[in-house]
UniProtKB/Swiss-Prot annotation:
<comment type="function">
    <text>Converts molybdopterin precursor Z into molybdopterin. This requires the incorporation of two sulfur atoms into precursor Z to generate a dithiolene group. The sulfur is provided by MoaD.</text>
</comment>
<keyword id="KW-0808">Transferase</keyword>
<comment type="pathway">
    <text>Cofactor biosynthesis; molybdopterin biosynthesis.</text>
</comment>
<dbReference type="InterPro" id="IPR003448">
    <property type="entry name" value="Mopterin_biosynth_MoaE"/>
</dbReference>
<dbReference type="Pfam" id="PF02391">
    <property type="entry name" value="MoaE"/>
</dbReference>
<dbReference type="GO" id="GO:0005829">
    <property type="term" value="C:cytosol"/>
</dbReference>
<keyword id="KW-0501">Molybdenum cofactor biosynthesis</keyword>
<protein>
    <recommendedName>
        <fullName>Molybdopterin synthase catalytic subunit</fullName>
        <ecNumber>2.8.1.12</ecNumber>
    </recommendedName>
</protein>
<feature type="binding site">
    <location>
        <begin position="107"/>
        <end position="108"/>
    </location>
    <ligand>
        <name>substrate</name>
    </ligand>
</feature>
<feature type="binding site">
    <location>
        <begin position="40"/>
        <end position="42"/>
    </location>
    <ligand>
        <name>substrate</name>
    </ligand>
</feature>
<feature type="binding site">
    <location>
        <position position="123"/>
    </location>
    <ligand>
        <name>substrate</name>
    </ligand>
</feature>
<feature type="binding site">
    <location>
        <begin position="130"/>
        <end position="132"/>
    </location>
    <ligand>
        <name>substrate</name>
    </ligand>
</feature>
<comment type="subunit">
    <text>Heterotetramer of 2 MoaD subunits and 2 MoaE subunits. Also stable as homodimer. The enzyme changes between these two forms during catalysis.</text>
</comment>
<dbReference type="GO" id="GO:0030366">
    <property type="term" value="F:molybdopterin synthase activity"/>
</dbReference>
<dbReference type="GO" id="GO:0006777">
    <property type="term" value="P:Mo-molybdopterin cofactor biosynthetic process"/>
</dbReference>
<dbReference type="InterPro" id="IPR036563">
    <property type="entry name" value="MoaE_sf"/>
</dbReference>
<comment type="similarity">
    <text>Belongs to the MoaE family.</text>
</comment>
Length: 154
């Protein structure tokens, strides 16, 4: 499913950007809420402060199928009108967006919940792997979701 040339579910090296999606998508007249999540790699002190980029890899056929399933589940579960789920592959520098979820719905409450659900389920279920690339050039695969000192998922 696409909006113009922008797919609802996307996994790849090209980045469409939130601005383009928001400007090209015609929001239905009965929708009063759009909730956007952007996942952006960071170089946090708790990670050693030595990360330059993240490199993402995936099993595309399986990942896209699962992303489409999550999109449909989100629409059905929360009654929102539309959901976009995009994830970049390849090298993504610190500060550049790598993951986007946009939920569009009638009201803010279900739209916020839908966006959160799509983000969380994508992180849990979609086979996307990331490697931390350090400033000295070495890389290290991240196994599972990292948690910070307070137990929050990063």
């Amino acid at each position: 499913m696409e909006v113009g040339m922008i797919p609802r579910v996307y996994l790849g090296h090209e980045w469409f950007g939130a601005e383009r999606i928001l400007s090209e998508y015609q929001v239905p007249e009965d929708c009063g809420a759009q909730v956007l999540f952007l996942g952006i790699p960071r170089n946090a002190p708790e990670d050693g402060g030595n990360i330059e980029a993240l490199e993402y890899e995936a099993y595309p056929e399986m990942a896209i199928k699962e992303m489409e399933k999550i999109r449909q589940e989100t629409i059905e579960k929360f009654g929102v009108k539309e959901v976009f789920i995009h994830h970049r592959l390849g090298l993504v520098k610190i500060g550049e967006p790598s993951f986007l979820v946009l939920a569009v719905g009638g009201h803010r409450e279900e739209t916020f919940k839908a966006c959160r659900y799509a983000v969380d389920e994508t992180k849990k279920r979609v086979p996307i792997w990331k490697k931390e690339i350090f400033k000295e050039g070495k890389g290290e695969w991240v196994l599972g979701e990292k948690k910070n000192a307070s137990g929050q998922t990063k």
